[in-house]
């Protein structure tokens, strides 16, 4: 069809993730209700998900993202091979976090050279979380970060919660996490509390070595920026030494692809 116009409402919608180009995939979803108006040139939709989820292959190590609730207003435009999508008033919650965001996405310019294809595209996303489970931070680190980095965060953060979380992703997703600042931004900053941080997790220690004491009851600022991770201005203590309190703790991994930790 060269021209069409559709208006309708769908409930209980489930769409499987599908192949698109060169190993890239389209996302899927489940448990959705959609009120949509669309033509061949684009459209708009009100999206609600209850006890469902999104499927994001190629984005996270765990591609299925369960959602207790999600609501969003979505618009899109189609111009030949070029696609653009804007999502506003996005509010979401699940067992790991609760927050809101806004985002825009478009296909990359395939005419820029052989390393470029239309997908995974160019993203501009900003959002906030009012609550987050610190032990699940690793689950939301993108696959563009090395597995060793993501697994270090998984094994090092043993407990804790976060509030006032700010996150930003801006740039061609092919370049994530944007180690060259001219390519874009990738940043997550959060106020954390009651954190237990095993900065040398047992799996990184030699067999038979005595364990390094974890930092406990940490409260401060946790920042992921490009390929780095930092703990700033934290207070806390060491496991097994309840009478010792620490102030102004600073911990840094300058490059998560090489897990070298500095703690002051």
What are these regions, as identified by a protein language model?
Residues 1-86, 97-234, 238, 243-264:
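Membrane-proximal interfacial segments on either side of biological membranes
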